[in-house]
UniProtKB/Swiss-Prot annotation:
The keyword Acetylation applies. It comes from the Eukaryota. Heterodimer with CENPX, sometimes called MHF; this interaction stabilizes both partners. MHF heterodimers can assemble to form tetrameric structures. MHF also coassemble with CENPT-CENPW heterodimers at centromeres to form the tetrameric CENP-T-W-S-X complex. Forms a discrete complex with FANCM and CENPX, called FANCM-MHF; this interaction, probably mediated by direct binding between CENPS and FANCM, leads to synergistic activation of double-stranded DNA binding and strongly stimulates FANCM-mediated DNA remodeling. It comes from Bos taurus. The modification N-acetylmethionine is found at residue 1. Its main location: nucleus. One of its GO terms (molecular function) is DNA binding. Residues 112-138 are annotated as: Disordered. Belongs to the TAF9 family. CENP-S/MHF1 subfamily. It is found in: Nucleus; Chromosome, Centromere; Chromosome, Centromere, Kinetochore. One of its GO terms (biological process) is DNA repair. The gene is CENPS. This is Centromere protein S.
Amino acid sequence: MEEEEWSEEQQRFSYLQRLKAAVHYTVGCLCEEVASDKDMQFSKQTIAAISEVTFGQCENFAKDLEMFARHAKRSTINTEDVKLLARRSHSLLKYITEKNEDIAQLNLEKKAKKKKKLEDENRNSVESAEAGVEESEN
């Protein structure tokens, strides 16, 4: 039993390290992009510090999102939780709200297309069935 727990702990640690490495890589890429745009340099220590702060903030966001969902007696985080998290940044909240509305609109359009297609298929199958009945009567 202890070996299983140790193995799970090792897997979690490995996963966490990979996540941190991915964040560090992404921060490094963003810093390079900003550096080339602004004609400046970022030290490795600065990139590492930004990466650590970013990772820590993401952990806090994840915990907050879990708490918001749990408070609403849900086990799934939804867009309302994300909006609540972003409430202090008006520009971010506006962006998230707009994207959410865009996605909702796309979903409505897809649903309408699917419904129309289904109705057309049903109409066609009824018409072909009626045509088959007429032929058999003749």
